[in-house]
Structure formats: C-alpha cells, structure tokens
Amino acid sequence: NSNYYTCTLVPDIAFFKEFTTNFDDKMIYAFENVKTRQNLGNDLGKKIIAKLKSKGMKEPWIYYIHLMDIHTPFSVPSEFDKQENGETKYDRLVSLVDVWLGRFLNEINMENTIIVVSADHGEYIPATGESISEIPNIQRLLTKGQTSISFIEKMRMKTLLNLRFAAQTYRKEKLKRTLSPYEMRSFNTRSALDLYDELVRVPLIFTGCNVVESKVIPDLVRSVDIFPTIIDMIGLCNSIKSDGRSLLPLINNKKLDELPAYMEVGINLAQLVNSKTPKVLAKIIGVRTSEYKYLRARDNLEKNVRLFDLKNDPLEEKNIVDEKPKIVKKMEGILSQFTKDSKGGEGTLTDEDIKKAKETLLRLGYI
C-alpha cells in the first residue's frame, strides 16, 4: 500500500513460503539436506548480488533475505574450514557470512538504504566442538521420507528416538566427568525445556541512512520491535498494527521505558510421535526483563518454574524461585497478561499435518 517494491529470498519451507506470499518477487532456495541445500558459498551469494544489481529493483524497495548458513547441522565450505576463520564450525560460518555481508554492502547505496541484520534465534555451541545428538545411522533413518504417518511409522520413529536418547544419555554421563554444568548445557537442543540467553539473545544491527552515529545500545529490546522501527525510520504511516514499538528514539539518544519480552521454546519430533494427541504449542513459556528471567510450563503454573537473576547470575546457573516469591508473583503477572492477550489456539492434528510438521522439524534440526 506504500508503493514499495517487495522482494525476498527464503528457504523452501512451508512457513517461509506462506508469510512471503504477497511479495512482488520471491526466490525460493533449496534446503532439503546438508548435501543438496543451497547456501551463500555455492550459489545464493551470487544470486543476491545479481538481484541488488538488477534493473528490476525499482525504488523504493525492501529486500528480505533469510539465510540458513549458520544453522545446525553446521556445514562449512572448504575455503572457510580453516583455523584462521575461527575455532569451531559455528565461528567459521560466522566468518563466511561476514565476508558475504561485506560484498552485499558494496552493492548498496548506504546514503538512501537502511540495512537491518538480526536472527530469529540463537544456538547452542557444543563445548567439545561436536554435537552428541548427531548419530549418523539413526539420523539417516529418521530423515528417510515417508508417504504417510502410519501406526508402524510412528512406532519406528519412537524406537529410533529412544535409541538416540539412550546414546545421548551415555555420552552425557561420560562428559559430565570433565565438563562443568554450564559447559554441559551447550549440548542442549532448542526444543528442550529451557530458554537460556544463548538461544534468545540475538544480534540486532541497524545501519545506513537515518542512523547518524555508531554506538551500542544496552537496553532490552525485542524482535517484534524491528518492523515498527523500520516503518518509523522510512517515514511511513505509524498506524500499522504491530505487537512491537519503534526503537528510533533509542537510536536518536532518547529514553524509552523498558518493556518485557515474551519467549517460548520450540517443539520437537517427540511431541508429535510420542503422544496420542500431538500438540504444536510449546511446552515452556516465559518472560524476560533486564533484571530477571521467568519460565514455567505452559499448562501448569507450578511445573518447571525457574527464576534467574540476570544481574548477579548472567549465566543463569542458579534457580532462585524459592528465594524470591514476590518477584515470581510479579513476573507471573506479566506473563499471564501476555497469554491473556494472545488469541492463538491449536486444533486437532491430522496425519497429514503431522507428516508436514515432521518434515519441517527434521529440516530445521528440531529433533
């Protein structure tokens, strides 16, 4: 409605396809598996540069790019798989993305373009450099395509998941002898029952026009604030409905009252195959301020309850829920307001729904 030419580059996953439906120009890239997926090094980087150079980029434009290069399982191109690019595979993939970001910026007029860099979630980086979840033979069987989710197929997946869990448990017990509890949690998955800052504290960079100086803003902000900030920076109507707010005052050295951030864990394959009534809502929900993080089970106020003092315990190693009942009550009030305001729900999942969800979870590593 604002006469912007909208284009995007996203992976071939249903979620991304659906929310980019109304873009003027959409490029979908392959994300089938590690061996066949497209990434910056083998194709996508050149395509992005070609798009930025093309005459089809009618001003004003917005180009949304969702890259999966820094995503488990980590696959590092040979030219970046070197010590000089970082200690771990994750570090080396960050180096790869950094190089390509520089190439993209060389094709952009920074005087009339706003660039926003962020991530939809963080990642656990194994302390040993290798994930204990990767058990090749079981992984291949789990990712084997199926035409339906039959009773036999569900039992097969349950068996494989149980085998993998047993292997993971054995590996963890061995590692506990030499690693600290903090190091041990680096082997967790995003679909576990926790939301440490490793997963939810992500980078957020605004640069280009209307950003007059370089600085680091320490204030707590949220992903839902990104879109309202862009709208404000380019001067569009600020009446567009959104769950967030503009961060432009912070960018312009003004103060904003802190707003708490809502969070929830992802779901995993076990939730779909180990239950007679599969659910797609996250098991754990929570809320974070600059001082505290509060988590609990979605459907039980007294289950999996945790409270962390982020000022005095930034690594979130001590649960103080029994020591701070007043803070727990306050944080629960904030969280309850979030859940009250949300209008989402979940219906019954068909076998076809489970099949599609399983395929997506396998692709994204939520297993």
Residue positions per predicted region:
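Catalytic domains that recognize anionic headgroups
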Residues: 1-367
